[in-house]
Amino acid sequence: MRIPNVFLSYLRQVAVDGTLSSCSGVKSRKPVIAYGFDDSQDSLVDENDEKILEPFGYYRHLLKGKSARTVLMHCFNAFLGLPEDWVIGVTKAIEDLHNASLLIDDIEDESALRRGSPAAHMKYGIALTMNAGNLVYFTVLQDVYDLGMKTGGTQVANAMARIYTEEMIELHRGQGIEIWWRDQRSPPSVDQYIHMLEQKTGGLLRLGVRLLQCHPGVNNRADLSDIALRIGVYYQLRDDYINLMSTSYHDERGFAEDMTEGKYTFPMLHSLKRSPDSGLREILDLKPADIALKKKAIAIMQDTGSLVATRNLLGAVKNDLSGLVAEQRGDDYAMSAGLERFLEKLYIAE
């Protein structure tokens, strides 16, 4: 996939004159026309950004702390040996992109809560929240391009912008088809569902790895993308499971909230395939908020062996990950020690 030359020219010009900005550190365009009513135009731009990015700032504060994505990027760098400032730059881009995507996801999923607090659109409204999320998508692209220009010039910057665009397209394809399945009440096959997870959930981590490996001084061309992809898939399958089974998850998102949102998850799809006439589909189509009805649906999934099947699939992905990590590290166990510690904390106990 290629970014149009006219867009790349625009990006190059922006990198030179610094005419954009955001919370991500990119400079905002100053007003072109000034009529003398107010000479504090720099503060005007800053004030506007602060206002329009309030939903994003709210999530960044709500989700603060050393995230799994930050830890993972540093674990991957143990294989690559890249400068710390480069890893920090890529990690910040991934974190900002993740938080921005949550703003949009929570609107599209009609989620009322995020980490036990009101979702951003419940607090700031749909329009401002959506605009903030979309704005950060573009400011992150600018940050990625600037990082590439600063480190390796136009060739590296263009490669990073291309990779960012490719993965963002895949992410939106995954999110889009999940919404289509939900709104059309058309459950996908299990294979289709896993492919969607690769696009949507695995893609963000794969983006981070691909951006890291754009550094002009990278020597180790380890194929870490497959590892990143499977970690993302494992994360979502794990969420599918704990959404139905974990009381702490219920406290933060609501009991079996995936059902209320109308989502199809792996345990649901497995159960529908095993027993099409169990009554589960009729319950799911109601997008139930009633706890008793949700418990009935979970009981059906237990009867069809779907919760056990979910754990078995998680075990299979875990085995795949172990094999891929061993393949990339060779005999250098120290190289993969951080990643393996991370994975052990991620895995559901067998």
From Swiss-Prot:
Dimethylallyl diphosphate binds at residues 114, 200-201, 236, 243, 263. It holds the Pfam family polyprenyl_synt. The record marks 137 as: Important for determining product chain length. InterPro entries: Isoprenoid_synthase_dom_sf, Polyprenyl_synt, Polyprenyl_synt_CS. Its EC number is 2.5.1.-, 2.5.1.1, 2.5.1.29, 2.5.1.10. It catalyses: isopentenyl diphosphate + dimethylallyl diphosphate = (2E)-geranyl diphosphate + diphosphate; isopentenyl diphosphate + (2E)-geranyl diphosphate = (2E,6E)-farnesyl diphosphate + diphosphate; isopentenyl diphosphate + (2E,6E)-farnesyl diphosphate = (2E,6E,10E)-geranylgeranyl diphosphate + diphosphate. Mg(2+) 1 binds at residues 105, 109. It is an enzyme of class 2 (transferase). Its cofactor is Mg(2+). PANTHER family: GERANYLGERANYL PYROPHOSPHATE SYNTHASE. Geranylgeranyl pyrophosphate synthase; part of the gene cluster that mediates the biosynthesis of pleuromutilin, a tricyclic diterpene showing antibacterial properties. The geranylgeranyl diphosphate (GGPP) synthase catalyzes the first step in pleuromutilin biosynthesis. GGPP is then substrate of the premutilin synthase (PS) to yield premutilin. Premutilin synthase is a bifunctional enzyme composed of the fusion of a class II diterpene cyclase (DTC) and a class I diterpene synthase (DTS), with the corresponding domains and active sites containing characteristic aspartate-rich motifs. This is Geranylgeranyl pyrophosphate synthase. It comes from Clitopilus passeckerianus.
